[in-house]
Amino acid sequence: MSGPNPNKQPVELNRTSLFWGLLLIFILAVLFSSYFFN
């Protein structure tokens, strides 16, 4: 995440962190579901 002014857009950073958080939860859910089904 390279930018000229990273502190100028806190909303963008919040959206990025929220996106990665949801992605991590989705991956964990897929792993747990595959673990339970096998």
Curated annotation (Swiss-Prot):
Membrane topology: Single-pass membrane protein
Keyword Transmembrane helix: yes
GO biological process terms on file: photosynthesis
Cited NCBIfam families: PRK00753.1
Keyword annotations of the record: Chloroplast, Membrane, Photosynthesis, Photosystem II, Plastid, Reaction center, Thylakoid, Transmembrane, Transmembrane helix
General function of this protein: One of the components of the core complex of photosystem II (PSII). PSII is a light-driven water:plastoquinone oxidoreductase that uses light energy to abstract electrons from H(2)O, generating O(2) and a proton gradient subsequently used for ATP formation. It consists of a core antenna complex that captures photons, and an electron transfer chain that converts photonic excitation into a charge separation. This subunit is found at the monomer-monomer interface and is required for correct PSII assembly and/or dimerization.
S-S bridge residues: none
Designated name of the protein: Photosystem II reaction center protein L
Family: Belongs to the PsbL family.
Segments crossing the lipid bilayer: 17-37
Cell compartment(s), UniProt: Plastid, Chloroplast thylakoid membrane
One Pfam family in the UniProt entry: PsbL
Keyword Membrane tagged: yes
Subunit structure, as described in the record: PSII is composed of 1 copy each of membrane proteins PsbA, PsbB, PsbC, PsbD, PsbE, PsbF, PsbH, PsbI, PsbJ, PsbK, PsbL, PsbM, PsbT, PsbX, PsbY, PsbZ, Psb30/Ycf12, at least 3 peripheral proteins of the oxygen-evolving complex and a large number of cofactors. It forms dimeric complexes.
Any GO CC annotation of this UniProt entry: photosystem II reaction center
SUPFAM superfamilies xref list: Photosystem II reaction center protein L, PsbL
